[in-house]
């Protein structure tokens, strides 16, 4: 049984956690939402400075809550890609320094592999192969999980990620940042059938549409034009707009996910990322999965957004297979999940 201390600083959450045998001993998160809210989104320079201020206290708290000392930690991990490079470097530098000082193995972890691993924490009986729908502010992907470190991307967004679309539409509606939770809350008070909005389909050169790829930029533009039209008419039913937009996104993601699972004969679907907390998406996926005798797994809300417990879980799985990373490993703003094994020696 491997005990891992992990650090997550890929975007705007400073997090540290201790995980052993898919059991969370501590999961500490210092949120930066208040610091970024005045700007309507994440400011990379602000994020880096916040990480620098928070990192030591977050690591200390993770160890204290776990009730463990350095002698009981088997390895130290940190998110190394993809993400904001300045933010990644804070967590990476801390993890590599601790690994060097305490003579522990170091592992760099792909952020998306962490989101996949969140399902292992929530459902310890889960094992590959399965399909994972990753939906967050920066990513929307359908990933065939064949084994630890062995992934195939079957579908992805061609423009905006689903979470990014939520934030942009929230801004159009004057709802503030972050947009996802606000739209979800308002959608429960609105009529999802109030407005017909277009699902984004990706045309194929030979005709037809890509069965698994998504597009949300057109949907965002459709909402913008609808808002402008409604404003000229003097009525802006915010709750109905939120409900219609959310329902469109949820239907689009559900249709592609179910089709992908059926086409590849994958009976289990795991959902990960911040948008996995969305009630509309959960409702659509659960109903569709039940109709096709598929198993759909959602992590608890605490593991949907960025956290270090999921990074620790992914690191433990790699360490148990003999994988470690060199201390020369740097942060990368982009790295396909299919290239995750290049992080190890």
UniProtKB/Swiss-Prot annotation:
Q: Where does Fe cation bind?
A: 111, 115, 306
Which Enzyme Commission number(s) are listed? 2.3.1.234
Q: Where does substrate bind?
A: 134-138, 167, 180, 184, 278
One GO molecular function term of this record is:
iron ion binding
What is the uppermost EC class here? Answer: transferase
- Where primarily located? cytoplasm
Q: Which InterPro entries match?
A: ATPase_NBD, Gcp-like_dom, KAE1/TsaD, Peptidase_M22_CS, TsaD
Identify the keywords attached in UniProt to this record, alphabetized.
Answer: Acyltransferase, Cytoplasm, Iron, Metal-binding, Transferase, tRNA processing
Question: Catalysed reaction per UniProt?
Answer: L-threonylcarbamoyladenylate + adenosine(37) in tRNA = N(6)-L-threonylcarbamoyladenosine(37) in tRNA + AMP + H(+)
Q: Which cofactor does it need?
A: Fe(2+)
Q: Which CDD domains match?
A: ASKHA_NBD_TsaD_bac
Give the cofactor note: Binds 1 Fe(2+) ion per subunit.
Check the UniProt entry and state the signal peptide residues, or none: none
Q: Which Gene3D superfamilies match?
A: 3.30.420.40
Q: Which GO terms describe its biological process?
A: tRNA threonylcarbamoyladenosine modification
Q: Which GO terms describe its cellular component?
A: cytoplasm
* Pfam family, any one: TsaD
Where is the protein found, in the record's own terms? Cytoplasm
Question: Which residue windows are transmembrane per the record?
Answer: none
Note the PANTHER family from the entry. TRNA N6-ADENOSINE THREONYLCARBAMOYLTRANSFERASE, TRNA N6-ADENOSINE THREONYLCARBAMOYLTRANSFERASE, MITOCHONDRIAL
Role summary: Required for the formation of a threonylcarbamoyl group on adenosine at position 37 (t(6)A37) in tRNAs that read codons beginning with adenine. Is involved in the transfer of the threonylcarbamoyl moiety of threonylcarbamoyl-AMP (TC-AMP) to the N6 group of A37, together with TsaE and TsaB. TsaD likely plays a direct catalytic role in this reaction.
Family, per the entry? Belongs to the KAE1 / TsaD family.
State the name under which the record lists this protein.
tRNA N6-adenosine threonylcarbamoyltransferase
Organism of origin? Cyanothece sp. (strain PCC 7425 / ATCC 29141)
Classification of source organism = Bacteria, Bacillati, Cyanobacteriota, Cyanophyceae, Gomontiellales
Gene name on record?
A: tsaD
